[in-house]
């Protein structure tokens, strides 16, 4: 029982609202900003087992039902769990969640997609609630916690739906997020202008870096969450800093322009990657012309 106790308590609390629609138990817990919940500590995974969190993490199952529009997903979870438990082997809930999301969406979404959406839905709670969108009781919940971008090094757990909400300056800035795990995280740049004019941009990695810009006059927030890979959970660290404005041609950012930068550029051409630092002629593509210009820079 204890191995997956978080799942049992999560389901029981969610089903209480299904059986008794007027129940305010879950809403009351999620409205409290002074306890550990998926809103006050978004960095916790969906299986965090301490501080009565499993009861409050019923928000995760509530999210799945509301976002996917199919309450049968909870039944699929329990049916699959029962079959695997009957085999006598240890049961991991994460493949079960992944299969359930895949099933109710006919393959259109994965658990990684659900984690990304869950991150967005949790951000728009409390004072940030948007009428008619996201959680139907979002305005009654605590406003999700954010971090300051002045804390340049961040950590989240992989594979389990952890999130970080990072407030950025209301300025025109070029920024870069760097990590050794670019495939294990998902990043959105969220900009809110004049109240409810919301723009959400999905950022794509360029090697181990995510480049983006913020705008003056808008609330700028970075939403970072872990993807699902099926591997054991590890700590993912990432840093946030101003965009790199070093030497032209210094592709590997080691402070000099030399043959190592040529090697890095050629590797990017072969792998199809695109990093702005390698686009020497700024034509938004990396090819032999950039190699020629880089060699000229080295020889000059």
Could you tell me what each predicted segment is?
Residues 1, 7-11, 161, 225, ...:
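Functionally constrained cores in energy, signaling, and assembly domains
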Residues 2-67, 78-117, 122:
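Acidic/His/Gly-enriched intrinsically disordered linker/tail segments
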Residues 243-300:
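Cellulosome-associated attachment modules in secreted, modular CAZymes
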């Amino acid at each position: 029982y204890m191995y997956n106790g978080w799942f049992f308590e999560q389901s029981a609390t969610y089903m209480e609202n299904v059986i008794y629609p007027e129940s305010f138990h879950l809403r009351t817990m999620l409205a409290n900003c002074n306890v550990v919940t998926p809103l006050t500590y978004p960095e916790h995974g969906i299986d965090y087992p301490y501080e009565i969190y499993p009861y409050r993490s019923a928000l995760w199952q509530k999210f799945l039902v509301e976002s996917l529009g199919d309450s049968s997903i909870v039944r699929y979870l329990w049916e699959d769990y029962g079959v695997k438990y009957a085999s006598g082997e240890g049961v991991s809930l994460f493949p079960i969640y992944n299969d359930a999301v895949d099933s109710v969406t006919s393959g259109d979404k994965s658990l990684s997609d659900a984690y990304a959406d869950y991150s967005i839905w949790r951000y728009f709670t409390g004072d940030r609630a948007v009428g008619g969108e996201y959680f139907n009781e979002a305005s009654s919940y605590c406003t999700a916690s954010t971090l300051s971008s002045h804390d340049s090094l961040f950590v989240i757990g992989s594979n389990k739906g952890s999130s970080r909400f990072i407030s950025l300056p209301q300025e025109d800035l070029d920024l870069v997020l760097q990590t050794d795990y670019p495939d294990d995280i998902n990043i959105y740049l969220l900009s809110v202008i004049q109240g409810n004019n919301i723009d959400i941009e999905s950022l794509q990695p360029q090697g181990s870096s995510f480049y983006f810009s913020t705008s003056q006059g808008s609330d700028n927030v970075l939403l970072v969450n872990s993807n699902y890979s099926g591997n054991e959970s590890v700590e993912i660290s990432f840093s946030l800093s101003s965009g790199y404005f070093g030497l032209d041609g210094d592709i590997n950012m080691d402070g000099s322009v030399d043959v190592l930068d040529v090697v890095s550029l050629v590797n990017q051409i072969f792998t199809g990657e695109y990093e702005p630092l390698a686009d020497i002629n700024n034509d938004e593509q990396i090819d032999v012309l950039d190699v020629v210009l880089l060699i000229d820079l080295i020889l000059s």
